[in-house]
């Protein structure tokens, strides 16, 4: 991994713990897309059994390593220990931009948000972006309100409701396209 193929934007994916092998796919494809760090997250709707069973960090970090090699990444993203929702709320302040894809986001998408930030000349200060994706079953309305109060931007990913393992890919791709290197250099 000698080349620097990293994006100027660091993306931190706060992923509501999914069932079965979905986290493997999330880590593999998210690594290919340029995610910097994966933070498994325990929310109200996370299956209770998953909270005690998340013991596959070594395996997920190996998946990240292999995906980083395959996609010629300069760094290997880290998969952290799971954190609780309260810790997510604390992280909102630490990042330049924090996005929450949500099915009830009233047609306010990532492109609209980025254009608004460009018009306000705030876009050049954005280097660290958090994306919070809920688990199967989605995000509680109370969690959305708490995230909004902390300054998170609630955004739509379109008319269709995406699976938990898809939403992070779409949000990351849109961010990389709008702010970084996925769309090429114009």
Model-derived regions, located:
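RNA substrate-binding interface of SAM-dependent RNA methyltransferases
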Residues: 2-100
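Short glycine-centered, acidic/aromatic-flanked micro-motifs in structured strand/loop junctions
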Residues: 15, 133-135, 159
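Conserved residues at beta->alpha junctions
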Residues: 17, 104, 135, 165-166
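Residue-level recognition of oxygen-bearing side chains
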Residues: 22, 84, 138, 166-167
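Short, glycine/charged-enriched secondary-structure capping and boundary segments
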Residues: 28, 53-55, 113-116, 145-147, ...
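Short acidic loop-to-helix transition motifs that present clustered carboxylates
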Residues: 84, 106-108, 162
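Active-site/ligand-binding-proximal alpha/beta "capping" segment
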Residues: 96-144, 152-155
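Structured adenosyl-cofactor binding patch, chiefly the S-adenosyl-L-methionine
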Residues: 140-186
